[in-house]
């Protein structure tokens, strides 16, 4: 007697999502990489070939570290999707232009292995990998991570060295550091020359190699908004909160009227708001949650910049709010159609 064969299933059961836009990880990563090309060109233009060597080292190290880590963990090797390349590029944009290539490679290792693969790979990490790599570098090598190179045009350097001794100009002549020194001078009734707002806007100032040129970053951010890869609520809420808090702080202390604009154009606020805080994995999933997340980012960044011991607060504020994201997603959720309020 022949065995009875079971009929073919008429219904295939699978998990959601059942309908999607057709976009893939590789396509999304290509769009983000494309949006960063203007900032990359600006970095090489202002800081020269040393900036390009740091960028190439970070990108190559990130790809190699991810491939080796996935091989050792017996996971599918996914370096072709571009996520490791993007992590390396974003990390490079947060580093000083003259950082040694060995430290750049170490930062990529920390970003990819500790920041992503240890948690299970892409989609499972709780921290932004690039900023985690930067934070580890800053904690481990503070002197090297706070040594800045002026752009090829010395006009901005001359403006900053008027506020600091010449021998300290390289290590402390970022706009935010100069602004912190200027605050002390203003409280004593002294006037201080700072880099102009136009120099801040165009990027002809000292700083991390990918954060100084505002037009290039805005161009990339607008492209991501147009392509639908990021939600406007995060960059708008983040930047708006920082501007409001610094404006009120400057008004209460009778600082110049452009004090808040200086904070807007200085440091890593623009790149952080458009490219770091909007990371799909580490940011909230709901619209209301993203607004709360952006508000928290702005408050933390402003507090660290205005009252903290370190003049820049973007990196740490994003890492802190990354930890808060699961809590936001837990209590700020969309109610399914037909469902009622959640009771616990």
Which residue stretches match the model-derived regions?
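Long hydrophobic alpha-helical segments that form multi-pass transmembrane helix bundles
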Residues: 129-217
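N-terminal signal-anchor module of multipass membrane proteins
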Residues: 1-66, 70, 341-344
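C-terminal ends of transmembrane helices
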Residues: 64-76, 112-123, 219-227, 274-283
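Structural signature of hydrophobic alpha-helical transmembrane segments
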Residues: 48-61, 98-107, 200-214, 257-269
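A beta-strand-loop signature enriched in Asp, Gly, Thr, and Trp
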Residues: 235-238, 244-287
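Membrane-interface helix-loop-helix junctions at boundaries between adjacent transmembrane segments
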Residues: 84, 89-162
């Amino acid at each position: 007697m022949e065995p009875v064969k079971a009929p073919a299933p008429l219904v295939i059961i699978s998990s959601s999502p059942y309908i999607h836009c057709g976009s893939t990880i590789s396509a999304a990563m290509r769009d983000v990489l494309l949006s960063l090309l203007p900032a990359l060109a600006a970095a090489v233009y202002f800081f020269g070939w040393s900036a390009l060597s740091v960028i190439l080292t970070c990108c190559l190290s990130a790809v190699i570290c991810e491939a080796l880590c996935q091989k050792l963990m017996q996971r599918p090797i996914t370096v072709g999707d571009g996520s490791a390349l993007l992590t390396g590029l974003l990390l490079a944009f947060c580093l000083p232009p003259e950082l040694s290539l060995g430290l750049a490679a170490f930062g990529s290792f920390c970003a990819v292995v500790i920041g992503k693969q240890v948690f299970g790979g892409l989609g499972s990490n709780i921290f932004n990998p690039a900023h985690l790599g930067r934070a580890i570098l800053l904690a481990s090598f503070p002197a090297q991570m706070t040594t800045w190179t002026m752009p090829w045009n010395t006009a901005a350097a001359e403006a900053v060295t008027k506020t600091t001794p010449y021998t300290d100009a390289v290590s402390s002549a970022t706009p935010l550091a100069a602004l912190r020194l200027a605050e002390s001078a203003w409280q004593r009734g002294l006037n201080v020359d700072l880099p102009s707002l136009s120099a801040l806007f165009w990027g002809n100032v000292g700083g991390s190699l990918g954060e100084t040129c505002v037009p290039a970053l805005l161009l990339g951010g607008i492209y991501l908004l147009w392509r639908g890869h990021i939600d406007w609520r995060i960059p708008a809420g983040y930047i708006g909160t920082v501007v409001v808090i610094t404006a009120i702080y400057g008004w209460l202390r009778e600082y110049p009227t452009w004090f808040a604009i200086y904070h807007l154009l200085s440091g890593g606020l623009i790149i952080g708001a458009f490219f770091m805080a909007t990371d799909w994995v580490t940011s909230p999933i709901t619209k209301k949650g993203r607004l709360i997340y952006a508000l928290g980012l702005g408050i933390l960044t402003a507090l660290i910049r205005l009252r903290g011991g370190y003049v820049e607060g973007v990196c740490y504020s994003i890492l802190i709010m990354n930890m808060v994201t699961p809590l936001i997603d837990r209590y700020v959720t969309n109610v399914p159609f037909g469902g009622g309020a959640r009771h616990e």
